[in-house]
UniProtKB/Swiss-Prot annotation:
Keywords: 2Fe-2S, 4Fe-4S, Cytoplasm, Iron, Iron-sulfur, Metal-binding, Mitochondrion. A motif (Cx2C motif 1) lies at residues 268-271. Its cofactor is [2Fe-2S] cluster; [4Fe-4S] cluster. Residues 205-222 are annotated as: Fe-S binding site A. Disulfide bonds: none annotated. Monomer. Interacts with tah18. Interacts with mia40. [2Fe-2S] cluster binds at C205, C217, C220, C222. The C-terminal domain binds 2 Fe-S clusters but is otherwise mostly in an intrinsically disordered conformation. The N-terminal domain has structural similarity with S-adenosyl-L-methionine-dependent methyltransferases, but does not bind S-adenosyl-L-methionine. It is required for correct assembly of the 2 Fe-S clusters. This is Fe-S cluster assembly protein dre2. Gene3D superfamilies: Fe-S cluster assembly protein Dre2, N-terminal domain (3.40.50.11000). HAMAP family: Anamorsin (MF_03115).
Length: 305
């Protein structure tokens, strides 16, 4: 019977090594590829930093995606550029956006990114700012974000109701300057002789009798109504007397009108001049103009000159 291979697990079931303190500050060193050829420089660097809490990664491997970093693990990220800045341009050229996409999640809140030879220049931190880091005293710091639940209010904000002003209740001794009661009686300001004086009517308020005729009241007792009626009657009689100068009846329209006879002339004395000069009731309206004294006959509604 052939023998079968046997695998033996030699790892201990219980690891009694001291657990790593999570409160210790960890440091990540980022080195350009050229520093690997100088072993003495790496030895000097590890003499400065504690190896138990310090990790070293190459920038070219980090940029190529060959290395993964733990999340929120480092308090300080130091880019090795030599103290004299000999490798500054090389290191900054490798700090691309892909490197920051891996580096930023590995930094703790408030962790800092620094250069070995000094602070970042104004034009050297563009990719760090785009990655979400904030400039602070020549270095870049990861801001400490806080998560909080915010309730969503979709309704309209209710307006605060303004309480009405309390109504003032008038009491004894309450003074209100906005009431309609007069504080001073105007009649008390006049003496007895002032009240007895006749009222002086201004000249501009007096009616102009020459231009405007006064009208009598409906129940006039001063005699103005009788005076106005007498004036109207006199004016009417005068107008009737002027109309009686020439008044033709219906049966007189067929008679001969002779202007040579005394008393047979019109009141306007313009009957012979034409329609433009004749009265409204003139019997010669529509006839042509004729000479004064010319015989005019109106027979069967036809004028014969």
């Amino acid at each position: 019977m052939p023998s079968l291979p046997v695998l033996i697990d030699t790892t201990p079931d219980f690891d009694f090594a001291p657990a790593q303190d999570a409160t210790q500050k960890r440091t990540l060193l980022l080195a350009p590829p050229s520093i690997a050829a100088h072993e003495e420089k790496l030895r000097d660097i590890f003499a400065t930093f504690d190896r138990s809490v310090t990790d070293l990664q190459m920038l070219d491997r980090l940029s190529a995606g060959f290395v993964t970093l733990p999340a929120s693990a480092y308090d300080l990220v130091l880019v090795l550029t030599d103290t004299n800045g000999a490798r500054r341009n090389e290191a900054l050229g490798l700090l691309t956006r892909d490197v920051f996409n891996v580096l930023t999640p590995a930094m703790k809140p408030s962790a800092q990114l620094k250069l070995q030879d000094g602070p970042f220049q104004a034009t050297e931190g563009r990719e760090a700012i785009l990655a979400g880091l904030v400039e602070n005293n020549g270095a870049f710091e990861k801001p400490q974000y806080q998560e909080a639940a915010v309730p969503l209010r979709f309704g309209l904000k209710k307006k605060n109701k303004v309480a009405p002003e309390p109504v003032k209740v008038e009491s004894v001794g309450f003074v209100d300057n906005y009431d309609d009661d007069e504080l001073i009686d105007e009649d008390d300001l006049l003496a007895e002789e002032d009240l007895g004086r006749p009222v002086q009517q201004p000249a501009e308020c007096k009616p102009d009798i020459a231009k405007k005729r006064r009208r009598a009241c409906k129940d006039c007792t001063c005699g103005l109504a009788a005076q106005l009626e007498a004036e109207d009657a006199e004016r009417r009689e005068k107008a009737n007397a002027e109309l009686n100068v020439l008044k033709l009846k219906t049966d007189e329209l067929n008679d001969e009108v002779d202007f040579t006879v005394q008393g047979k002339t019109g009141s306007c004395n313009s009957c012979s001049l034409g329609d433009a000069f004749r009265c409204e009731g003139c019997p010669f309206i529509g006839l042509p103009a004729f000479k004064p004294g010319e015989e005019v006959r109106i027979m069967n509604d036809m004028a014969q000159l």
